[in-house]
Amino acid sequence: MARYVFITGGVVSSLGKGIASAALGALLQARGYRVRLRKLDPYLNVDPGTMSPYQHGEVFVTDDGAETDLDLGHYERFTGRSANKRDNITTGRIYQNIIEKERRGDYLGATVQVIPHVTDEIKQFVLEGNEEFDFVLCEIGGTVGDIEAMPFLEAIRQLGNELPRGNAVYIHLTLMPWIPAAGELKTKPTQHSVKELRSIGIAPDILLVRADRPVPPEERRKLSLFCNVRESAVIQALDVAHIYDVPMAYHKEGLDSEVLAAFGIDPAPKPRMERWEEVSNRIHNPEGEVTIAIVGKYTGLKDAYKSLNEALTHGGIANRVRVKLDWIESEIFEKEDPAPWLEKVHGILVPGGFGERGSEGKILAAKFARERKVPYFGICFGMQMACIEAARSLAGIEKASSTEFGPTKEPVVGLMTEWLRGNMLEKRTAAGDLGGTMRLGAYEARLQPGSKIAEIYGSEEISERHRHRYEVNIGYREKLEACGLVFAGLSPDGVLPETIEYPDHPWFVGVQYHPELKSRPFEPHPLFASFIAAAVEQSRLV
């Protein structure tokens, strides 16, 4: 039977519960255990798919097409296990399910209430489908005291009583701030956070204390005394240079040992940390450095491109180089010459995005990369803008544009209305709900034999994750290929362009999907490994 670890947060948000959960999952995996991670989000949105990147950060897409919290990306990258739609739930989804049941009459006329109906729905989500796992780690979004989180905290309190004795452990992540005027770390915020948690009925077994400097032994003893946890269970979570240092740091502090001790597992299997040691060594001891310009629309919030950032790091790990990122707002190129911004970089990446804002700047970035022979990687929107650039500059289609920006006589990029998923035909309309108009999840593609991208993958058949409404119009293939832009990858039915490339360019690749979502530190995605390798070659020329 699976054992459950519930991770809550206090004092302030953004302390890193997602990283802590992922790191603990990786440590338990390193000891040979089978681990599943789940995220419970208290917001009322059904999913984050329609939320602004500035509000929520990246939307992480799973193989089965779920739009989820970016923490699921951390879970996948740290553990190597692919998440699915059953690993993320929101208050909005919970209430949607309950209202549907109530309308069907499933509650047989009962008054539908937070307790027991909402809490029962949450508990069902936590418990279902865990038969093949040794540990299930559940991260509760938000902080203790948030009104939105109350049903989730009540549900995990109930689970602590309903599960067999010794099958649930509670970890509380808090902040221990340094007060310069006093010259000391303060325990009071953590004490009050634990007091709030205990008033709900949850007594934490382990305190994970975030701090920017070592926590003195006397302060640990103080937290142990006032928060009623063992002194060994007061674990400092110090700031580290890189997130892939976290598993090693937490292991050194004894987090995984304390969790296993709380479950009464003794003796515990010894962890194998060689892979994490190698990743850390490659990150901190690079043999070179390359600079990649990311020409995007949401560069003001780096979390909007979290998986992209990590995938580029993985590419650096594969090539033993440090990847320096130069974030550039694409609208700048609509006012200024791109050359001064781009002539010193070793690669240009144009990521996904939505809407017309900044699109002309991305087109100019693609043009610069094509003309100057700088490695270019266009992802989703970045591929579409590269095709529009080719249509305008090479094929003489001056009015080439996307129907996403408004009516156009030359729709090089247009709204998809139907496509195949396996043997099923899926249809969407522009008037449909935003959450239901996109091509989401893993789809197969066929790569052209002998193409650069087939060489990179080492295969002519691939499966990648998608998140887009618009697609390059296959009707322009002949004109664009006549200008040298090859449609090297298509959907299995040959209708949807999936990849493009210039054979006479050192490295110019566009993909309609999001390869960054499948990259892992131990298994860098081949496209990112190849892109960074091309940037290394470019660095020798600049």
Swiss-Prot record:
Annotated Gene Ontology cellular component terms: cytosol
A Pfam match: GATase
Binding-site positions, L-glutamine: 54, 353, 381-384, 404, 469
Residues that bind CTP: 13, 146-148, 186-191, 222
Binding site for ATP: 14-19, 71
Regulation of its activity: Allosterically activated by GTP, when glutamine is the substrate; GTP has no effect on the reaction when ammonia is the substrate. The allosteric effector GTP functions by stabilizing the protein conformation that binds the tetrahedral intermediate(s) formed during glutamine hydrolysis. Inhibited by the product CTP, via allosteric rather than competitive inhibition.
UniProt-listed InterPro entries: Class_I_gatase-like, CTP_synthase, CTP_synthase_N, GATASE, GATase1_CTP_Synthase, P-loop_NTPase
Region described as Amidoligase domain: spans on this chain: 1-265
Entry's family note: Belongs to the CTP synthase family.
HAMAP family: PyrG
Note, other: CTPSs have evolved a hybrid strategy for distinguishing between UTP and CTP. The overlapping regions of the product feedback inhibitory and substrate sites recognize a common feature in both compounds, the triphosphate moiety. To differentiate isosteric substrate and product pyrimidine rings, an additional pocket far from the expected kinase/ligase catalytic site, specifically recognizes the cytosine and ribose portions of the product inhibitor.
Complex formation: Homotetramer.
Protein name as annotated: CTP synthase
Taxonomic lineage of the native organism: Bacteria, Pseudomonadati, Pseudomonadota, Alphaproteobacteria, Hyphomicrobiales
Gene: pyrG
